[in-house]
C-alpha cells in the first residue's frame, strides 16, 4: 500500500506538470502547481524523518530474527519518501527553466543580449523564484534545489554560448564580463559563503579566451583546458563565432591545442573529476531543448508566460514572498 501511495504521488506531480506545460492556451493552465509541489516536498521530507526515527526506535525492540526485515521495510519506505521529495524539487527547477526558455532564445543575439540585458532579466527571474522557494521550502531541500538550479542555469548559459552563430567583438567580451558579475551576484544570493567564486571560475577563463587576440588566445585556452578538460568542440564553436577571427586563425589555434593535448596527454575529464563543462559537452547542439525538458507551448509562447504567472501568483499570495 505504501509503495502504491508513493507511486501515485510521483505520477500525480508529473501529470500536473505535463498538463500545464503542454496546454495550448493560457486559460487552460490552472494555478496551484508550485504551491502543491512545495507542500508535497516538505511533507515527504518530514515523513522520511519520522520514518528514520521509527527505525531507530523499533530496531532494538523486535526479535533479532525479524530485525533485518523491519529495517528493509522501513528503509524502503524512507527512500520512497525521499524520492518523491527529490522529484518535486526537480519539477520546481523545471518550472524556473520553463519560464526562462524564451529568454535563452535571445541569449548572445543582437540586439537583445548586447543592448537589452537578457542575462539581467534571467538573473532577476531566478532571484525572484529563489526567494520564494527559500521562504517556504525546508532549508535542507532549498540547499539541494538551489545547487541543482544554478548548475543547470550555468550549463544552459554555456550551451547557448556554444550555439552562438556570431559574437560581435569586442562588445561580446565586454557583455560577457558584465554577465559574470550578474551571475556571481545571483549565486551569492542563493548559496552560502564563497561558492560564487568557484562557480564562476570557468566563466572568467572563458572571458579571457574571448578577450584575447587571435595570436594570444591559446594561452588562456590552455589554462581553461587544464582545469576543465580539452573541450575542443566547445572552444572551436566559440572561436568560429568570433567575428574578429577568420578560418585560418581558428584552424591554427585548434592545431596548436591538439598538439599540446597529445604532448601533455591531457585527459578529457580533469583529475579532480567532472566540472560544469562535462554537462555542456554532453549536450549536443541539437538537443539544447533537453536542458529545459520536452516542453511544448501554444502560439507565441503563451503557455510559457501563463505558467510562470500562475506560479508567481500563488507564491505571492498569503505571505509566500519574503517582502509580502
What are these model-predicted stretches?
Residues 1-324:
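Extended alpha-helical "rod" scaffolds
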